[in-house]
């Protein structure tokens, strides 16, 4: 059956979605036993290894997926997430930039790149990337929230307030935004609004 590797890959994703990571691993490995150059299965196997905390194995899987399919934006993004987790921030930046070069409208890569720049203290770059993620995905509340905190770090409190207010217009129950908005109002000396 020529579609058998695809079916194993799909069943692996289903098992992963159910939290049955050992079964997911087995399914991806079956797919790869039949079709060793199946980039998507290598990527999914990497995600599963990462969830299991087997980070070295995850790196190998993402790198294998990229070697097979160099224009695989999702694998570059996933490798970036893993490198970020390993505190290899400069390498993570390169992975996200590759993902964005391949897929310029990849909101998650712009967001992840922004988080990494924020971690590196490159706040102006982080702001640009958060804004790009939001331009692509206007309901990206995490990007708005982190944009607000970055603007706050830059001393742009009024603009940070606008960012938090935009989150609450999208999702009025986003508790972290309420908290951040209150703290920012307090820092602005607007105690009535802070309450």
Language-model segment annotations:
Residues 6-17, 40-51, 74-85, 108-119, ...:
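Conserved alpha-helical positions within TPR/SEL1-like repeat arrays
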Residues 34, 68, 183-195:
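Low-complexity/repetitive intrinsically disordered segments
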Residues 19-25, 34:
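Leucine-rich, hydrophobic repeat-scaffold detector
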């Amino acid at each position: 059956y020529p579609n058998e590797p695809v079916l194993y890959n799909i069943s692996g994703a289903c098992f992963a979605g159910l939290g049955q990571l050992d079964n997911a691993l087995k399914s991806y490995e079956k797919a790869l036993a039949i079709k060793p150059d199946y980039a998507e299965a290598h990527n999914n196997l990497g995600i599963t290894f990462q969830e299991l905390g087997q980070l070295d194995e995850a790196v190998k899987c993402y790198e294998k997926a990229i070697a097979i399919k160099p224009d695989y934006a999702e694998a570059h993004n996933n490798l970036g997430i893993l490198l970020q987790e390993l505190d290899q921030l400069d390498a993570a930046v390169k992975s996200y930039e590759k993902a964005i070069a391949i897929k310029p409208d990849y909101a998650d890569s712009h967001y992840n790149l922004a988080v990494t720049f924020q971690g590196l203290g490159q706040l102006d770059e982080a702001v640009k990337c958060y804004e790009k993620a939001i331009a692509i995905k206007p309901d990206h509340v995490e990007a708005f929230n982190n944009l607000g905190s970055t603007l706050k770090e830059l001393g742009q409190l009024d603009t940070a307030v606008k960012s938090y207010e935009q989150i609450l217009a999208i999702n009025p129950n986003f508790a972290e935004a309420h908290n951040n908005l209150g703290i920012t109002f307090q820092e602005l000396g607007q105690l009535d609004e802070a309450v």
